[in-house]
Amino acid sequence: MSAVPEQILGASSANDADPQETHEWLDALQGVLAAEGPARAAFLIDKQIEYARVNGVTQPFHAETQYINTIPVEQQARIPGDQDIEHRIRSYTRWNAMAMVLRANKHTNVGGHISSFASAATLYDVGYNHFWRAPSEAGGGDLVFVQGHSAPGVYSRAFLLGRLTQDQLDNFRQEVDGKGISSYPHPWLMPDFWQFPTVSMGLGPIMAIYQARFMKYLDSRGLAKAGDRKVWAFLGDGETDEPESLGAIGMAGREKLDNLVFVINCNLQRLDGPVRGNGKIIQELESEFRGAGWNVIKVVWGSKWDSLLARDTKGLLMKRMMECVDGEYQTMKAKDGAYVREHFFNTPELKAMVADWSDDDIWRLNRGGHDPHKIYAAYKAASEHKGQPTLILAKTIKGYGMGDAGQAMNVAHQQKKMPVDAIRKFRDQFNLPVADDQLEEVPYITFPEGSKELEYMRQARQNLGGYLPARRQKAEALPVPQLSAFDALLKATGEGREVSTTMAFVRILNTLLKDKQIGKHVVPIVPDESRTFGMEGLFRQVGIWNQEGQKYVPEDHDQLMFYKESQTGQVLQEGINEAGAMCDWIAAATSYSTHGVQMIPFYIYYSMFGIQRIGDLCWAAADMRSRGFLLGGTAGRTTLNGEGLQHEDGHSHVFHAAIPNCISYDPTFQYELAVVMQDGLRRMYAEQEDVYYYLTVMNENYEHPEMPAGVEQDIVKGMYQFRKGVENSNAPRVQLLGSGTIFREVIAAADLLKKDWGVESDLWGCPSFTELAREGHDVERFNLLHPTETPRESHVAKSLKSARGPVIASTDYVRAFAEQIRPFVPRRYVVLGTDGFGRSDTREKLRHFFEVDRYWVTLAALKALADEGAIGRDKVAEAIKKYNLDPNKPNPMSV
């Protein structure tokens, strides 16, 4: 049995009333460690702490450990394989990653990052050679979130394996001509390569957490086996300041996601300077993650420190490691061995430890993140750990190998070019076969066919199931119900029976859940608003998923719709957590690619807390080619009438219109919703189009009419004729457009126009101004590029072609929403909207305040007719008086 280390005995001797007793306790613990191992020792310590607390002993909580490696040398798993070959592969990968950025920026300013992958090369190399499995017959493979700025290194490895060509590398960040590769991981741009977009920073970590949990969801519901699959997420230490990076780590700990591994590349630098110059980011992150219930493995020092630490019998080296702040550590790696000797080994005792070392020996003291032996041991421990997610904190050097051109320098992140001298030093450090006269060119280097290095790389990936990154683009198509399955919603609700479009959605959802072929694929997601949307019936019907089941008797267990949690439940209940719910939705919406099984997610939320709050995740979902339905509930500026400024959504459709593969609709009637959702199911799950849907639904109850005959395709296109005015009438005529609940005000305005002013109206439901605008712009583009062909007509122009009179549109959204179609309206076009701050009041008063109700629509129609000379202007003045409209009323935009 080895003796208790002196640094432990001496650490608190000044406050030790009985050193002999302390020695005996530590000797006893050492005996347990030697005879029964660390697990038994940890158990006994936990029991002692528990007993002490019960008996009133208080002690401060220390979430951080010493600034040394978590895994002792004697417990370090030995890395298999040929490390000389792996080092050469890693060196080639480093060079080509650097060359790619330098070559791309010789004649352009497209940018790119050298320093991030330079610091992380070993972290990725060990994973690709030994751990990360590709999808295969044996299983679904591991999911790897590559930190975005390290993309050049992943391309470099793919190039060495023959997966990418030199032409593609030379067109890094130059994609328009179809030859290039994307700046960061973008599945939209490289759909068979990248799986997960990890830029913007912070999105990768939170998405990885929910991917890991969704893997458990699929497994417990019997839809896809999780087995020992893992989700690996790589992020930078500076990235952890993004709220999304750490915002969900508590959930991961609480849910015991032992299929999740975070690897944080702690190169101590962010874009402008140190991450924590006056502190220690590794210690800070260790505390946060341990406090959240994670298993934390620190990989701080490389093997070249092992002998020094073994000789540190008094703990002076560990003390110095602990007191030295990150700003100092960074500076030391930007200098040289002499500087490190002077400033790190800064006491006589420490200097004596390296007295017989040269400055070069000191300079070669490596960091853990650059040591494949230490990284392998950490990865293996993480892969085998049960009951907790694991965090690996790997200390590295930003710009490793860049020398005077960037190593550990504050400018490292922005370096896109390097002088020849720096390139020469890089070549020499990694012993690469590039001649001096080639350095200016920075050529790519490869392993010849049949070389042991190339065969080694291929065999490593073959052993792990195939190449990564790789992305599956299709899964088995689902049998989508015909529109007739929703026949009840195509009929009128009947006199006196009022429902909301939210209620109609819940009815459609229930129909799908009960469908024998696709019901199990439906994933309802709600952020603590099921009762708001009338969905509490799902609690008992399909249950709320919880991998621990339900360990308590719910308060409402004797009621029909009691709160039921189950290991096989179907509803994902996220609590007040829109970002988490959106990540749930993304995991389900990309399940066809990540797990080979199509899932149909429906995420319903207050529309104001959708894209306005988690817009970057909506863009990431688009990039990932997500398929599913987002539903903005209580949508529109005036529909959520009592909540006030922050809660009233007048712009979500405008935001969603910017996302190219997001298809959005604002339906008024239940038949519109049924038609749109059935068509969406067909497009996404039968045809497997890479689109997703945003639908707004309301909580306002009213009667719904029967669907007019033959309008299904026009509803999908975004505009259909709801009702035609009296034909062959010589009366003045207008075309009235609307969507959502405000279309009902437009219908009422048509009645006022006829009754009070003798004006005929044709009524057009416009469930998607966005789709109308997209189709219109596409038609315009075709006509621009095909001047000698018969011009095409947009759906808007075609619909209004034979109609007469000015066109007036009113919606519950800002004017920009309906303004989208102005270029395609073939006559005078007037748009009403809810521009301005929201406020609380009744719906009637709010609609009057925002000037979108039936009276303002009527006034706008009369004014448009007067402007065209169809009626006198005195009629407009008369209407203002008749409807008690205040000419001096403030513009709602200004108050």
Swiss-Prot record:
| Sample GO molecular function, one term | pyruvate dehydrogenase (acetyl-transferring) activity
The enzyme's E.C. designation: 1.2.4.1
**Which spans are transmembrane here?**
none
Catalytic activities: N(6)-[(R)-lipoyl]-L-lysyl-[protein] + pyruvate + H(+) = N(6)-[(R)-S(8)-acetyldihydrolipoyl]-L-lysyl-[protein] + CO2
- One Pfam family in the UniProt entry: Transketolase_N
Q: What class of enzyme is it?
A: oxidoreductase
Q: Which cofactor does it need?
A: thiamine diphosphate
Q: InterPro entries annotated for this entry?
A: PDC_E1_N, PDH/Transketolase, PDH_E1, PDH_E1_M, THDP-binding, Transketo_C/PFOR_II, Transketolase-like_C_2, Transketolase_N
Keywords assigned by UniProt, alphabetized: Oxidoreductase, Pyruvate, Thiamine pyrophosphate
Subunit structure, as described in the record: Homodimer. Part of the PDH complex, consisting of multiple copies of pyruvate dehydrogenase (E1), dihydrolipoamide acetyltransferase (E2) and lipoamide dehydrogenase (E3).
- Main role? Component of the pyruvate dehydrogenase (PDH) complex, that catalyzes the overall conversion of pyruvate to acetyl-CoA and CO(2).
Its recorded name reads Pyruvate dehydrogenase E1 component
Q: Which gene encodes it?
A: pdhA
